[in-house]
Structures are given as structure tokens and as C-alpha cells.
Regions:
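Short functional linear segments
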Residues: 1-48, 55-68, 73, 109-116
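Acidic, Mg2+-coordinating active-site environments of NTP-dependent enzymes
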Residues: 112, 137-144, 160-253, 266-284
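A glycine-rich beta-strand to alpha-helix segment
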Residues: 396-426
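C-terminal helical cap/extension that packs against the catalytic core
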Residues: 203-213, 218-222, 237, 306, ...
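Hydrophobic alpha-helical packing residues
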Residues: 59-64, 133, 379, 425
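Beta-strand->loop->alpha-helix junctions that form or flank phosphate-binding loops
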Residues: 73, 200-201, 213-235, 255-260, ...
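ATP-dependent carboxylate-amine ligase catalytic core
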Residues: 31, 36-39, 65-158, 204-207
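Nucleotide phosphate-binding/pyrophosphate-handling subdomain across enzymes
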Residues: 135, 140-145, 151-164, 168-172, ...
Length: 432
């Protein structure tokens, strides 16, 4: 990693220290200073509470299978910032990252000289992604919202080809509202007049909000319900499913994942592709592409029988629990969370629904991390199984590996936890 790259990353990480939230007028002005690179892209805009990253990865893979040049913008990153900007399936290189950073920073300086505020952390990276995509000749850009949708910086891209809304749950309530309906309203804020909408069935309240928004904005709208596909089984750590749809034929689809929630995410992406390409599309190529997708931090096997899952809200933990297979040997849970999440409910759900005979807790390295002892006490209130408290993720991860003994290990509760664990493994690999 070059010194220049380190300096660029440090600058971006320091942005929250001297900026505040800007409105969409500011984001549009920022993009205008960059030459409005988003206007040269065919954008697929994705919002939702859970599953956004997976849907984006599936869309990107199928677009590439169609021979399209793609850009993928997602957040957060788990280990390196480059993960957020992907060109034709490859993370942007350090050199290209630095080149785009310098171009964006130069325009930011011009904005500041004109009396305008500095872009936020997320705005800056969004601008970098749009410029990187334009410079690379990207045709289709898959863009994931950062938080919510209505006021999200990505909503400054005003002309998407299609809008996708994944499952909606209770998360970020301090910003998005304290009911499913309010949160759905924020997510539905990315819906543009006349732009087709595909959304995942969640509950009647969120469905009603999305349907009403599409009616008001005269959009084609399609709901992807759980009755639209059938899970056929899990074999060799792949999940197989079929679709109740003649377009796909009598075909079995496979995903390189054991999460029972992933077929719904895949079908949401598939139906969006079907709308875009119709009879000119190649579902057989999509099938091959989907089977090869590995999306980090979602039931991702990082070592033999060791999985990380970014579930960090109650609905995601419920979906995770449904995906854990029964095991005669038992399972080990490694858990951590940030203080402002409803971790008590998450822990109660785990203890109630997952067969585990050992729980290990730790405090993540981020300042927002919940204390390990506090997490341990909550587990002890909900289980009579052993609860081991370790102050650092590194010590906790070492402990579960030493005590695995043929059992599956599942690490969840925070994307910060997922990133720390993946970072530890990368460090070991680099030393070998």
C-alpha cells in the first residue's frame, strides 16, 4: 500500500471531524463541479434495510454476464476503502483511487473558495465513484444508498433506469423514524416519477407506503413475495431454489451462500434485469453468474466452518437464525454490537432460535462499541450455556478457533465485527 494511498484514505476518514450533513442541493452542486459524471451512467438505484449489498452484487454480476461494463458503489467497506468502488468486478486499484481522489479534492477546493461547505464523508466517496465510473467508460452503475434514501447523497442522481427496494426493518430509527411506515417512506424517497420499481415484500405497512408512492409518481411497480420462489435445499454450502415464473423455465438456480434470505434478494435482482432486458436477456448466463457471486459479510465462510454475517438489527438476526442449520456437534456464536443498536433484542433472538452451546462476546474496536461485559450479562440472562467475555475481537476470535472442535462458528452483530475479523485473517495471510 503506497504512502499516497494512505494519505488519501486518512483524509477521507478525517472528513467527519470538520463537516456536517449537507442537503441534496449541495450534493448536486458538488456533482456539477465534477462535471455531472452520473449523467453519463445508466444507474440502478438500490435502497432498503437489509440485503442491499447482496442485491447490488447480484445485479452487477448479471450485467457483466450480459457483456456490460459496470460500476458498483456500495457501503460500508469491511477492510479497505477500495471495496466501495468496483469496476467490472474488480475493486479500484490504489493508483486509480489516488488519481480520482486528487481530481475530486481539487474541485472541492474550488467549491470552498466559492464559499460552499466541504462534502461529507459519504458525499466525497459518492463523487469519487461517479467520476471513476465515468473515466473508466462504465455503462451501467449499480448504486447502493448509504442511509435511508430520500435525503441520501445518492439521490442526487436524478435519472435512474430502475429503482430497487429490499426488505425493510427497524434500523437507524434516530434518523429514519420509529415505525416501519416512516422508515419505508424514507426508503421510498428514491422513487422517481415514471421509473420502474421492484421491491421485496416485508409487511403490509411498508408495502402500502411503497405502493402509494409508486401510484403517486406513476411508476410501474412489482412486489417480490416469498411465494415467488421455492427453496429446494442446501447442499455443499450452496442454496438451490426455483422460480414460479415461465421466463426462467423449469430451472434450478444456485447461490454460493447458505442464507435462506438470499434467494429473495437474487430474485429481486433477476426481476429487475428481466424488466431491463426482456427477451434480449440471457437467463442462462445470469444463472452461471449468480452461482459464482461471493458477497463479503453475508453468511460468508472465511475459514472452514467459520462464518461471518453482518446482521446488526433484529430483522437481520431473525433471517440469520433461520439460515443456521441444525448441528449434532452444536454451534459457537461470537457476538458484538454497537451501543446504539437494539442488541438486547438481538441477543434474545439468538438464544431463542439458534442451537448453540457456547457464546463468546467482545467489544469492537470502534468507539461506538458496546462493552463486552454488558453484552455478556445480557447473554447470561437468556441462556444457561457458557458465556465467555473477551475485551478485544482478536482475543475472542482466537478463543473460538482454539475451542472450535468440529463445531461451526458464526460471528455476527456488527459490520465492524465482520471487518475486524476479515482484517485479522488478511494480516495472517500477508505474513505467510
Amino acid at each position: 500500500m503506497s504512502r499516497t494511498y494512505e494519505v488519501a484514505v486518512k483524509y477521507i476518514l478525517d472528513i467527519p471531524r470538520f463537516t456536517k450533513k449537507n442537503d441534496l442541493v449541495h450534493t448536486k452542486t458538488f456533482l456539477r463541479y465534477l462535471g455531472d459524471p452520473q449523467e453519463d451512467l445508466k444507474i440502478l438505484h438500490v435502497a432498503g434495510t437489509n440485503g442491499k449489498g447482496s442485491v447490488c452484487a447480484y445485479l452487477d454480476a448479471m450485467l457483466r454476464a450480459e457483456g456490460k461494463h459496470t460500476g458498483l458503489f456500495t457501503s460500508p467497506h469491511l477492510v479497505r476503502m477500495n471495496e466501495r468502488i468496483v469496476l467490472d468486478g474488480r475493486q479500484i486499484g490504489d493508483e486509480s483511487f489516488c488519481q480520482v481522489f486528487e481530481e475530486v479534492l481539487s474541485k472541492v477546493r474550488e467549491m470552498q473558495e466559492a464559499g460552499m461547505p466541504h462534502p461529507t464523508f459519504f458525499e466525497f466517496l459518492f463523487g469519487m465513484a461517479m467520476l471513476a465510473f465515468q473515466k473508466a467508460g462504465v455503462e451501467y452503475a449499480v448504486v447502493e444508498t448509504g442511509l435511508g434514501g430520500r435525503l441520501d447523497a445518492t439521490n442526487a442522481a436524478e435519472h435512474p433506469l430502475v429503482t430497487v427496494i429490499t426488505s425493510i426493518g427497524m434500523d437507524h430509527m434516530e434518523y429514519l423514524g420509529d415505525t416501519i411506515g416512516k422508515i419505508a417512506g424514507e426508503k421510498a424517497g428514491i422513487i422517481r416519477p415514471g421509473v420502474p420499481v421492484f421491491y421485496a415484500q416485508t409487511c403490509e405497512e411498508s408495502d402500502r407506503v411503497i405502493r402509494q408512492t409508486t401510484e403517486n409518481r406513476h411508476c410501474f411497480c412489482k412486489k417480490i413475495g416469498k411465494d415467488a420462489y421455492e427453496i429446494l435445499g442446501i447442499e455443499d454450502k450452496h442454496i438451490a431454489f426455483s422460480c414460479a415464473n415461465a421466463y426462467y423455465g423449469n430451472t434450478t438456480w444456485k447461490l454460493n451462500n447458505i442464507g435462506v434470505y438470499q434467494p429473495g434478494n437474487a430474485l429481486l435482482a433477476m426481476e429487475s434485469m428481466r424488466f431491463l432486458f426482456g427477451e434480449t436477456g440471457h437467463p442462462k448466463l445470469w444463472r452461471q453468474a449468480l452461482a459464482e457471486v461471493k458477497w463479503g459479510g453475508r453468511m460468508e465462510e472465511i475459514l472452514p466452518d467459520v462464518y461471518v454475517d453482518g446482521a446488526h438489527n433484529i430483522s437481520a438476526v431473525e433471517a440469520f437464525a433461520q439460515s443456521v442449520p441444525e448441528s449434532a456437534e452444536g454451534n459457537i456464536i461470537l457476538f458484538s454490537a454497537v451501543r446504539d443498536k437494539e442488541y438486547t433484542e438481538m441477543i434474545a433472538c439468538l438464544c431463542r432460535n439458534v442451537q448453540a452451546d457456547l457464546y463468546v462476546v467482545a467489544q469492537i474496536g470502534d468507539d461506538r462499541g458496546a462493552g463486552a461485559s454488558a453484552l455478556g450479562k445480557v447473554f447470561e440472562e437468556h441462556t444457561d450455556k457458557p458465556v465467555i467475555v473477551r475485551e478485544s475481537v482478536k482475543d475472542a476470535f482466537r478463543y473460538v478457533l482454539e475451542h472450535q472442535k468440529g463445531r461451526a462458528v458464526y460471528c455476527l452483530g456488527s459490520l465492524y465485527l465482520t471487518g475486524e475479523i476479515k482484517g485479522l485473517i488478511q494480516e495472517v495471510k500477508q505474513k505467510c
